[in-house]
Every structure is written in structure tokens, then in C-alpha cells.
């Protein structure tokens, strides 16, 4: 306080008067300073980074429950050789799935009272361990109200002292005798899960392919501390929820392609009956062979009749999508995407695609809804169909709830504890300089580009209908999905038409932007970090997802001398044949940075019944010789500022500039 004088705080008096309402006396302000100083010297909480979950809700939920192997590690540390491996496995499974595991135990256990006594004591030990790096206040806020007092007593009493040992045993025995053991065990297990992960970062792509994006969003909406950096698939769904019909068509097409209807129908109550009726009528005699869904990634078993219907719906929505996208491209010549309007290059009579002077035979030649003289015009039936589907998307309450969550906790990028998080790319030129991208009348690049696109995505959803700004933003959200200079995409094109209709694979090629090659260079990564206000150093990193790391071919997730980490390891089953693994979690705790590599998750049922955990391999990316404390984090910087303000308030009290309120 030595350098704070009454003169130096005169200009801060209005703010200090407001602060004095929360801390009305010298004693209150002093106590808060002591509390904050104590917090600064605790170990930093554990951050978990996940990316490209793609609707794989069971694997996602399991990784949250087992904290990427941290719970198992702690159980091993605590019980070591005092328990058999099978017993430690039982404790872990109970912590992950308390309700389901309790059900099984009750069917098998002969002496339930004894089991309760042993298990509750074991859970108390685990809970004491995971809560030890937090203040009592923080732990208290995480406690379920009905058991708050009892859990606090159990956590903060040592069972080594004989008197206290008896006290703890009485509490546990009473929990059992009052038939509250089940509820108490569930509460303890959930608390252990919650305290093991302090904060969760989702670096994009919750949606697409897998069956349960809506279940993942439900989990996140109730999660205690998380943030999201939007991925291209998330943005596509946000565009659909904002009312962009091209985005809506894309979302439905992807669902049909992977035969995953659960998110649309069960999750969001989207009525697909109009599409089914239209597809059955329009393509009644059409085998639609090339539109058969990829069944090895489907969310359910379908009979032949249903599969036939999904195939017809897939074709119907794909044709509609190509027309809707052409409308945006014509309306927005500034997007520079004329090369994605391709239907007028089709000779429908001869069934060939004429591209750059060369003819390519089409894989499908039946287009009853396309008028060769005006190929981009929606038929009256197609327009009516899109009107009905649009209305269904706009009226889904569950979708509105999830979108609010994505907007509240999400953004295009995040800087957190010297780490820069974004899903895909920051567009670059070949020389490594930032690419200037024109949006409207201005050019944006680097950080400004990501901020501008973030703002446009929000405008598309929240702005009043009818304004020019809203209409442009709505169109731009679609550009963010497939536009060449979109930071969430950054390829020369999305070859949707060619991949469906042309067999020649030379036309399927999508060339990635310069970023994806240049991000291997440390100098380029340093320049990007500086652009986003992160000082390059040994503990500064860029964290990306988006491009699956082909571990099976020897590709490494750690790039540019450790400055950049790509943590898309294939949560999505569709990518696991490419990656050879089933996802990464990056874990950043007080001892350093670890990359956890997961093998495929069998199923929730096997985890509960057989105690099957995800097999994970931990790679140490960085080891801190000294433990990282809260004072070394962004939160620590905030607390230091609060302490300085409270110090000023103390000076104001002690010099009479502000009077204490008794």
C-alpha cells in the first residue's frame, strides 16, 4: 500500500464509493484482500480442450465423466496397492455412472450396508483429493444444496484423529440408516466429476455426422464452466437457426448423408414429413443410387423401406440446396463464388457436365424438378416445401435454447492463459502475411477478420428482420460455411456438386488455403499470436481442430516446435479410419500441458456393465518445473487488479476520503 497516496486515488473516488457498498468497512475490505491473496497462491485449475465432437455424445460424455483419464489416475494414486485393480475399476465406474452402477450393485451385492460403508469412505477420500486445490468457498458453491453441510464436514475433517474418525463414521452410518446412501453417493460422484475439470474449452464442431449433437448441447447448457469456439458445422446450424434456407438445406442433406435423423427429429422436433412426401412423389421410380446414405455411421438400424425413403429425401434436398446456393451467389457477386453455380453447365438431354471445355458423364441423369431453360428456379412444390421446413426450424424451442447457449458462451476465437483458440484458420497469403478479405466496403485481416465475422454471425441471428444488414449477414453465414476466404473454411471451393454427380476425382479436389501449410512454421505462429495480443513464449500456443490428424500415417498433432497443437483426432466415427485413433483431449493443469490420445469408446452400456473405460495414452507436451499458480493465469491478473482496487479503498477509509458504514 506504500505507493498508494490519497492524492493518487482522488480520480477513482466515484468507483471506490461504489466498491464501498460491497465492502462497507476496513475489516470487510481487509478480509477480501486476504482471501484473494490466498486464492492467488493456489494451483491453477485444470483446463480441458476438446474439438470436433461431431455429435458423438456417448464418447464426449464419457470423456467428461472420466476427465480424460484423470479420475482413474487419482484413484490409482490414492488407493495404490491397498485395493485390487478390479476394485479400483469398480470405484471409477461408480464415479462415472453412479445411478446406473448403483442399480447393478443392488442386484449383485449380498451385504449392501457393508458396501455402502466402504464405498462412502472411499468416495470421501477421492473427493478430498480433487477438492484440495480449491478454496472452501469454491467447493461450497459446487455442492448440491441438500448435502452441502454434510459434505463440507466430511471433506474438511481428518479421519486420522481418533475423535474425528468416530465423528465421520457416525455421519456415514446415519446416511446409510436414513436410506439416503444412494442419493449421497450420486451427489459425491457428480461432485468429483465437476471438481476434476475446472474449465472446458470446445474448439468447434459439436454438430454434424454423429447422432447426438442435441444431447451434447444439453450437457453443455448445464455445465459449470465452458466456452466454445465455433466450427464450420456449428456456424452452418447457427445459419439454419437464423433462417438461411441454404444452410437449412445443407443441414438436412448432411443428416440424410449419414442417416442420422435423431438430432433433427428427436432433438429439435423438425417435421421432415413434407420432405418425405415430396421425395416419394418426385423420385418414385428413381433408384437414387448415388444418394444411398453412409450406413456404417448411422444412428440406428433402418429397414429397407426407410432406407429407400432416406435416399430419396437425400436427393430431393441436394437438388434444392444447389438451387438455393445459386440464389445467394447471384445476389452477392462480391462473394466471388460464380464457379459454384454449375447447373447451367449441365447438358440435361445428353447427361453430361461441360466444364472448361471438357465433358464429364453424370452419375445421375434424372432431374424432374430442374427446368433446363432455367435450372436454378425452384419448382412451386420445392418452394412450398422449403417454406414449411423453414417454419419448422424457426419454431423449434429446443433449437432456440441451444443457439442462445452457442451465442452466449461461444465466439470465433478465444485467448485464455496465453493460449489462442480457434477452430480452423486465419487466412494467410503465400508469404505468411495476413490475407486481406473484403466484406462490404472494407477490408479485414487477422484478428479484425475474426471479430468482423463473429459480429456478422450474431447480426444474422439477433438483428431485426427486414434490414439490409440482416440480409447481408444471413448470406454471409452461408459464406462462412463454404466461402474461399472464410476463416472457418479456407479452401478454394466446396465441391459438393462434383462429389455427387461426377465420377472423375480430379474435379473433387478442394485446395486448402496457405494457412494449413504455413502453420508448421514457428515464425508464422508467433506472428499470429502477436496479432491476437498473445506474447510469444515457451508457454504460448495456438490450439486448432478442423483437420483430422492422420496419426495412422505418422502425422503428429504438435507442430511448429510445439507452438501449435491440432487436437482433432477423430471423435467422429466417420474419421476414425483416417486418424487411426478416436480423439484427443488437451489437458492444461498446474504441472504443465498434456495431450491425451483416446482409443475408440465401445459404449455407455459396456462402460457400466463391464467397467470398460476409454483406453488413453498421455503425451507430455510441456512440463512446468514450478507448479503454475492462479497468480500466473488470466484469472490471477483479474484478482491482482481487484486487490489493488481494495487497497485503494483501504487508503480512502483510513484517510477519511470515504467513511466506513457500520
Where are these regions (language model features)?
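Feature recognizes metal-dependent phosphohydrolase scaffolds
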Residues: 1-662
